[in-house]
Amino acid sequence: ARDGYPVDEKGCKLSCLINDKWCNSACHSRGGKYGYCYTGGLACYCEAVPDNVKVWTYETNTC
C-alpha cells in the first residue's frame, strides 16, 4: 500500500477544499484506509491505498 492523490478517469487529481467526508469516502471506495482534503494541493489525499490503484504522479500528469 502507499499514500497519494487518487485520480479520476482523465488522470487528474480529485479536487477537494473542505469536504473531508467526501474525500474519505472516495478513498475507502478505492480500498484506502483514510482520506482528507489536502489544502496545499487543493486535492483529495489518500493513505494506504492498494498498489494497483492509480495515484497522481508528476511524471504522468496530464492535467
Curated annotation (Swiss-Prot):
A molecular function GO annotation: sodium channel inhibitor activity
Q: Which GO terms describe its biological process?
A: defense response
* SMART domains listed in its UniProt record: Knot1
> Which ranges carry the LCN-type CS-alpha/beta domain?
2-63
Where is this chain's protein located in or outside the cell?
Secreted
Q: Which GO terms describe its cellular component?
A: extracellular region
Tell me where it mainly resides: secreted
Q: In which tissues is it expressed?
A: Expressed by the venom gland.
**Annotated InterPro entries:** LCN-type_CS_alpha_beta_dom, Scorpion_toxin-like, Scorpion_toxin-like_sf, Scorpion_toxinL, Scorpion_toxinL/defensin
SUPFAM superfamilies the UniProt entry points to: Scorpion toxin-like (SSF57095)
Disulfide feature:
12-63, 16-37, 23-44, 27-46
Q: Which UniProt keywords apply?
A: Disulfide bond, Ion channel impairing toxin, Neurotoxin, Secreted, Toxin, Voltage-gated sodium channel impairing toxin
Q: Which family does it belong to?
A: Belongs to the long (4 C-C) scorpion toxin superfamily. Sodium channel inhibitor family.
> Domain description from the entry?
Has the structural arrangement of an alpha-helix connected to antiparallel beta-sheets by disulfide bonds (CS-alpha/beta).
Chain's role: First blocker of sodium channels (Nav) found in scorpions. Is lethal to crustaceans (Cambarellus montezumae), less toxic to insects (crickets) and non-toxic to mammals (mice) at the doses assayed.
> What name does the UniProt record give this protein?
Toxin Cn11
Q: From which organism does this entry originate?
A: Centruroides noxius (Mexican scorpion)
